[in-house]
Amino acid sequence: MKSKFLRLLALFLTIGVVAASCGSDSDDAAPATTAAPATTAAPATTAAMATTTAQVEVVADGSLLDTVQARGTLNCGVSGSAVAFSETQADGSVTGIDADFCRAVAAAVLGDAGAVNFVALTASERFTAVQTGDVDVLMRNTTWTQSRDSSVGMDFGPTTYFDGQQLMARVSDGFSASSQVSDVDGAVVCTNVGTTTEKNIAEAALLAGAEITLLGFETSDEVYETFIAGGCDITTTDGSALVGRKVKQQPADQEWVIFPATPISKEPLGPTYGQNDSAWADAVNWTVYAMIIMDEYGITSADVDAACASAEAEVGRLCGGEGELQTGMGLPADAFHQVIKQVGNYSEVYNRNLNPVGLYREGSANAGWLDGGLIYAPPAR
């Protein structure tokens, strides 16, 4: 037991330093030491990410909310290569659930869901981009952790997707959906170098008594190319990313399986922004909460106009009716009406982006609280 503890301590000290210095999640993006893959480039129709704070218009002594409204555009940091979360398409458009949450914030703050400049960021670029003002908010599969909340200078909004790290292997190698980490003894595991994914799998294998060989790669594309070619037995990252890659890249002559059923880590993903700006945090957070509340009432983009025309109580307030609280937040009274009308409620955004890759709310942590899940919003009153 003492020997295992000492090995675990050494592992934390070695891998923890690398992961902290890179600031990277298990999030399907390249570390800062390499150029981002072509698919992560910002859409051609939008401006490139600013490289100096001099390029960012800032309202003196005001909230970022004032800055964004004066600018008329939301600069939203995304991955650009995360399947079903934020993918830059051939025509320059950006699709995915993260991209839709960017649009929702733009609809609330600016009245126009299309007023978004999507900025593709690598894992190591993302926090710097927020700190320098190059982006206003991250909607970029970024895990909420204690260190990021306390020492990196970030604040985190509501969790929009509850994820967890899992492993993926070939059925032909003897793995199944019921496999456990202890079953990977002797395996070669591919993952992104210098990430929390690397740290998590090394720790989990050690605790399970499994000896593994870790192969680290600078980009996720390299990870999956090596896995497909048979250069490693297993790949590991967030479960949602594995599902997306399986749908998009599994060869016809291979069958991939994801395990264990219970993830080896907790990965709460949601909006991230600079710390100590309550007005901006309120605008971002309540955009998400409004989408969740309207979902609970069954109000969708198709019927929100009719619902708001006669709504009372909580829905009426969110629609901008009597007792509304949006103007006191620095938003238009109908801010959340526009969010639902232009983008949709939480289920609409989730279903159109994640259902096609096999990620369903039912029975998952991402179900609403009334359905046994963790998606929940405080009352709008």
Name each model feature, range by range.
Residues A50, A54-V59, D100-R103, A107-V109, ...:
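Extended ligand-binding regions for polar small-molecule ligands
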